[in-house]
From Swiss-Prot:
UniProt keyword list: ATP-binding, Kinase, Magnesium, Metal-binding, Nucleotide-binding, Thiamine biosynthesis, Transferase
Stated family: Belongs to the Thz kinase family.
Positions that bind substrate: 48, 196
InterPro entries cross-referenced by the UniProt entry: Hyethyz_kinase, Ribokinase-like
NCBIfam families cross-referenced by the UniProt entry: PRK09355.1, thiM
Pfam families assigned: HK
Protein's name according to its UniProt entry: Hydroxyethylthiazole kinase
Origin species: Coprothermobacter proteolyticus (strain ATCC 35245 / DSM 5265 / OCM 4 / BT)
Family annotation (Gene3D superfamilies): 3.40.1190.20
Pathways per UniProt: Cofactor biosynthesis; thiamine diphosphate biosynthesis; 4-methyl-5-(2-phosphoethyl)-thiazole from 5-(2-hydroxyethyl)-4-methylthiazole: step 1/1
Catalytic activity: 5-(2-hydroxyethyl)-4-methylthiazole + ATP = 4-methyl-5-(2-phosphooxyethyl)-thiazole + ADP + H(+)
Gene (UniProt): thiM
A molecular function (GO) term: ATP binding
Length: 270
């Protein structure tokens, strides 16, 4: 390990609050409402739609686009592809969250078609999803990673393969630009006891991506998640109260980031 990277997390969070970016979510039906609540809690503005008829228009007005394939359907898939092509054409910052990639042929084909557009400057997923995108074998059950090869190597490979920033989330989070790999060891174990926490990370990344470059956006978002999870866990009795407290704590942090400390990223030798 060597020294941590220079990322001004507090300044990035302040910019999100001051600019109130519009984040276009094309996301799954399980986490959609909470992602909208979270977007508002951190000072940004959400718009949620899976309609192919308005996808291009939504991309045009958005400051960042998040495509999450968690609950695919024919209509949603067409909308996502339309949005990806439009984001590429307009140069809008876009994130792909390939939820459950590898679980079915439908998800594999959809993700491959989305990546072929070249629209995504940031790809995030859990260790299993990122490992499969890297070309490694890993078992995926539902949308949870069951087992994977080292996520750090997988993140670096995906970043190189798709010319993007890649983030692999898990007990340890890894972010890579294809040359360097950074690790963050901070998330509380209760994040694995609630559905949608990975989707929340996508929302945070999209909000940050609207005001900064992909690498600091991913790192700032995951640092916020890590810091908030530790504070929220101290104030909670279990996963249920923890889930609610996460929204309150992330609101408090983004309103006054200088009053909080954030977990530190480290540069790995991979």
């Amino acid at each position: 390990m060597v020294s941590q990277p220079s990322v001004n997390i507090k300044e990035i969070l302040e910019q999100v609050v001051s600019t109130k970016p519009l984040v276009y979510h094309m996301t799954n039906m399980v986490a959609m409402a909470e992602q909208a609540h979270l977007t508002l809690a951190i000072g940004a503005s959400p718009v949620m739609s899976l309609s192919s008829e308005e996808a291009a228009e939504m991309v045009n007005i958005a400051n960042a686009v998040l495509i999450n394939i968690g609950t695919p359907s024919k209509e949603a898939n067409e909308a996502m592809l339309s949005a990806a092509h439009t984001a590429k054409r307009l140069g809008k910052p876009a994130i792909l969250d390939p939820v459950g990639y590898g679980a079915t042929k439908l998800r594999i084909n959809l993700v491959e078609r989305l990546l072929e557009t070249g629209a995504f400057s940031l790809v995030k997923g859990n260790g299993g999803e990122i490992s499969l995108l890297a070309g490694e074998r890993a078992e995926v059950r539902g949308v949870d990673s069951v087992g994977s090869p080292p996520a750090a190597i997988a993140a670096k490979t995906v970043a190189q393969k798709y010319n993007c920033i890649a983030a692999a989330t898990g007990p340890d989070d890894y972010v890579s630009d294809g040359e360097r790999v950074y690790v963050l060891r901070s998330g509380h174990e209760w994040l694995t006891r609630i559905s949608g926490s990975g989707c929340w990370a996508g929302t945070l990344m999209a909000a940050c991506l609207s005001v900064t470059e992909p690498l600091p956006a991913a790192m700032s978002a995951l640092s916020l998640m890590g810091a908030a999870s530790q504070i929220a866990a101290e104030q909670s009795d279990g996963p249920g109260t923890f889930r609610i407290r996460m929204f309150d704590v992330m609101y408090q942090i983004t309103q006054n980031p200088h009053a909080f400390s954030f977990p530190q990223w480290e540069l790995m030798e991979v």
